[in-house]
Amino acid sequence: MFVSTNIMEEEPVVNAVNQIKDKFGGLHIAVNCAGTGYPGRILGKEAPHPLDAFQFIINLNLVGTFNVMRIAAELMDKNEPDEKGEKGVIINTASVAGYEGQIGQSAYSASKAGVIGLTLTAARDLARHAVRVCTIAPGIFDTPLMQLAPDKVRDPLLESTQFPHRFGQPSEFADLAVHIVENAYLNGETIRLDSGMRMKPR
């Protein structure tokens, strides 16, 4: 089932969640993956970083994540607890840039650091409702967008990986999400999925 929505606004997300409820009878798992970036230094060659661009990235990556999380949690709270006493699991997506933002990533890095900072608080807020919250902070993954990147972009990123010395596969992100759902003792954690890489300044 595919439902188009705008995570930055309340009504479209409520409508999307209600469609899920109508078809499946409820909601037990929510994985927040929507997001984007904006390359730009705080002081560019001709002008400061556009404020509206910074606000858009924060609104999409951080506020949008919070918006989906709160609306999903409201529906999860109506579930009957499962055999573990759990009503739902929310998995948010951050980035290693939330820890080591590169030059020109101020908006993206700030938005993902916000998601990381939100994780434990959200888990504590929702504990009384038997809803767990975890975050995955992926490194560099071999996505269609990355496959289009030139070698001068890909090679330095690949050099930052440790073992395995390669880009991550989307299936590995999915595997971790499934593990978080299945492991009822994981809560309030941000898990780096990056083969031990640490981002260089550029």
Language-model features and meaning:
Residues V14, G37-Q55, E74, K78-K84, ...:
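Conserved mid-core segment of classical short-chain dehydrogenase/reductases
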Residues E74, A123-D125:
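Alpha-helical segment proximal to the catalytic Tyr-Lys
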Residues Q169-L193, R198:
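C-terminal substrate-recognition "lid" of short-chain dehydrogenase/reductases
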Residues M69, S111, T119:
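Active-site helix of classical SDR
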